[in-house]
Amino acid sequence: MRLIIRPTYEDISKWAANHVAQKIKEFSPTREKPFILGLPTGSSPIGMYKNLIKLYKDEKISFQNVITFNMDEYIGIEKNHPESYHSFMWKNFFSHIDIKKENINILNGNALNLKKECEEYEKKIKSFGGIMLFVGGIGPDGHIAFNEPGSSLTSRTRIKTLTQDTIIANSRFFEGNVNKVPKSALTVGVGTIMDSQEILIIVNGHNKARALKHAIEKGVNHMWTISALQLHKNTIIVSDKKATYELKIGTVEYFNDIERENFNNDLK
């Protein structure tokens, strides 16, 4: 596991965007050989999306031959609801780039058969040979996607009941009203994410410091699903300084030392 520590949220957003863009460029995707990208929602990736949009507008990257799979979607709200993850992705990313609509995959939280929807999502990911790069964030309790504490670390895409902590945290998107937040969602599983060739996690803010400590310094534990990534062969966590405040000084110095030459990853 790699840990890239940068001073601010703006710095890690730029670093994450550059990393995603570089991976796509290195792959040189075509219509017959697309790049398969896993994407998150929430507040953590917004800065990354803004930077990716800028790279696209500066003609440094194209998404025409990129196929995306999103991590999750609420159950019971329409796609055009302002707080659905369909709406989030179109507002913050898809409508600003050249991605083809048919290349966008987001779980349908209103499918008639939700179990079948999850099974078909897994099959579609596998049909493309799996996710090449899965980008994500984490919650204060260490959850990744909607894999709440206690989730199986081998779980697949499924229906998941949200914890009260997650509902409260997400109420900021629903006028601060916890009663308006959906109580369940469809989510890729920890196992689904672990099958990806590479994982990039964005961590920012004081409230994520405890989760980052469990991700980096503690053992693998299903109560902190982010910790499963310790077992992945190619995971990068990019974190701002605030999120490192519970890490040991030695841990921070170690990663700063070995990653020093990777702090600047601007596209050539």
Swiss-Prot record:
Cellular compartments per GO CC = cytoplasm
Q: Which InterPro entries match?
A: Glc/Gal-6P_isomerase, Glucosamine6P_isomerase, Glucosamine6P_isomerase_CS, NagB/RpiA_transferase-like
UniProt site (Part of the allosteric site): 151, 158, 160-161, 254
Enzyme Commission number(s) of this protein: 3.5.99.6
Query: Can you tell me which residues form the catalytic site?
Result: 72, 141, 143, 148
The pathway to which it is assigned is: Amino-sugar metabolism; N-acetylneuraminate degradation; D-fructose 6-phosphate from N-acetylneuraminate: step 5/5
Per its record, how is this protein called by name?
Glucosamine-6-phosphate deaminase
Q: What does this protein do?
A: Catalyzes the reversible isomerization-deamination of glucosamine 6-phosphate (GlcN6P) to form fructose 6-phosphate (Fru6P) and ammonium ion.
User: What CDD domains does the record tag this protein with?
Assistant: GlcN6P_deaminase (cd01399)
The biological processes this protein is annotated with in GO are: carbohydrate metabolic process; glucosamine catabolic process; N-acetylglucosamine catabolic process; N-acetylneuraminate catabolic process
List keywords of the entry alphabetically.
Allosteric enzyme, Carbohydrate metabolism, Hydrolase
* PROSITE patterns on file: GLC_GALNAC_ISOMERASE (PS01161)
What this protein catalyses is: alpha-D-glucosamine 6-phosphate + H2O = beta-D-fructose 6-phosphate + NH4(+)
Q: Which family, according to the similarity comment?
A: Belongs to the glucosamine/galactosamine-6-phosphate isomerase family. NagB subfamily.
Relay the activity regulation note.
Allosterically activated by N-acetylglucosamine 6-phosphate (GlcNAc6P).
Which GO MF term does the entry hold, naming one? identical protein binding
Q: Name one Pfam family in it.
A: Glucosamine_iso
SUPFAM superfamilies given for it? NagB/RpiA/CoA transferase-like
